[in-house]
């Protein structure tokens, strides 16, 4: 049935936001009747959706483009690195076309140009109403906005993806409903700046009452989360910038409407470094808020990311960061050594930190946080949790608790000696038997 259809090869690189863009393009391709294949060999055209956030990601994208050109020869480039067409063509002048991020229509026009759209076939053009998804069937990313209004000095995202542009709340909720109807058990809300949702709209628009499913709602983040919480699935928030109104989300978590999980990138704890980064600078206020959040929602899991070795970071600045970790006792933490990014203000700042110092600070940071994370997980031993199954194999079951986002957090390894019938996407009850620095181990509760 599909052998005569034109074949499109597809490579998706980068973060979950880019993954959502890839899903959108793949959905359009399938709707137009193209066959998606995982290899270069038999492809009539290859699309590479690139990442350009840091220099290592740029290099990975350029290598992927080069490999596609070498193996196939007909390549269209899109995504974040596509915003720097000159950079791409300097290395790979033979690419057919280049577009920037979220340029779905342009990508499809280019595909039609080089590989004409096949005749409509109702059996082939049929696409699930939730669209093509690259994640397992039981979870999906829901992108609520594009771009960012912040100008952090280490970041070039606004130059590639533009200023904040929020989707309408009814559009977001319609997509979420389709995902749930398709069997999704966990929705992961993503954007460049999730807590800024709808702040690009006027006050009048934000306060305007709209109707969804017959219910009056406001066009803001709190209303969005309240409605998502009524869909009967796990709802997890990522990339939450620490605006004051984030405090209003915590009661929703305490009430079980959305998962008690906040992915809130703090980046540093030194006021001097935060100012240089153009990030919120009151770390004392942040600690006060964390304490209050945990009082309201004791089960709250806090994830954050930090940068060590930022230009001008002294040993004193770094010690402030370590002191913050000891006091905040965050559950999940990612750490990155500052990486110069072409076009970022911080790349040109004076007092660049030597690589060996960055490396040493990174290891000191990770060693401390590993001890904190291990102690936090140890507190869960002996307790009973509901977990969502990701995989089942001969060795047992791999699942995640409400504290574990896919790909970036730990997992729960569950013994299943009696081969109890369990499948991916199922919620099960387990008792935690032990813990290490990142993962939990558990037994099934019949």
UniProtKB/Swiss-Prot annotation:
Note one Pfam family from the annotation.
Answer: Radical_SAM
**rRNA-binding among keywords:** no
Q: Which reaction does it catalyse?
A: L-aspartate(89)-[ribosomal protein uS12]-hydrogen + (sulfur carrier)-SH + AH2 + 2 S-adenosyl-L-methionine = 3-methylsulfanyl-L-aspartate(89)-[ribosomal protein uS12]-hydrogen + (sulfur carrier)-H + 5'-deoxyadenosine + L-methionine + A + S-adenosyl-L-homocysteine + 2 H(+)
A GO cellular component annotation here is:
cytosol
Tell me which CDD domains the record gives. Radical_SAM
Chain residues that bind [4Fe-4S] cluster 1: 15, 51, 80
- Compartments it resides in: Cytoplasm
- Supply the enzyme class, top level: transferase
A molecular function annotated in GO for this UniProt entry is: aspartic acid methylthiotransferase activity
Cofactor detail note: Binds 2 [4Fe-4S] clusters. One cluster is coordinated with 3 cysteines and an exchangeable S-adenosyl-L-methionine.
One Gene Ontology BP term is: tRNA modification
Sorted alphabetically, the keyword list is: 4Fe-4S, Cytoplasm, Iron, Iron-sulfur, Metal-binding, S-adenosyl-L-methionine, Transferase
Which EC number(s) does the record attach to this protein?
2.8.4.4
Q: What is its main location?
A: cytoplasm
Radical SAM core domain: which residues? 134-375
Q: Which InterPro entries match?
A: Elp3/MiaA/NifB-like_rSAM, Methylthiotransferase, Methylthiotransferase_CS, Methylthiotransferase_N, Methylthiotransferase_N_sf, NA-bd_OB-fold, Ribosomal_uS12_MeSTrfase_RimO, rSAM
Query: Which metal ions or organic cofactors does this protein require, according to UniProt?
Result: [4Fe-4S] cluster
SMART domains recorded: Elp3
Question: Which family does the entry's similarity section mention?
Answer: Belongs to the methylthiotransferase family. RimO subfamily.
Q: Which NCBIfam families match?
A: 30S ribosomal protein S12 methylthiotransferase RimO, MiaB/RimO family radical SAM methylthiotransferase
Q: Which HAMAP family match?
A: MTTase_RimO
Per its database record, what is this protein's job? Catalyzes the methylthiolation of an aspartic acid residue of ribosomal protein uS12.
Q: Know the name of this protein?
A: Ribosomal protein uS12 methylthiotransferase RimO
Which species is the source of this protein?
Pasteurella multocida (strain Pm70)
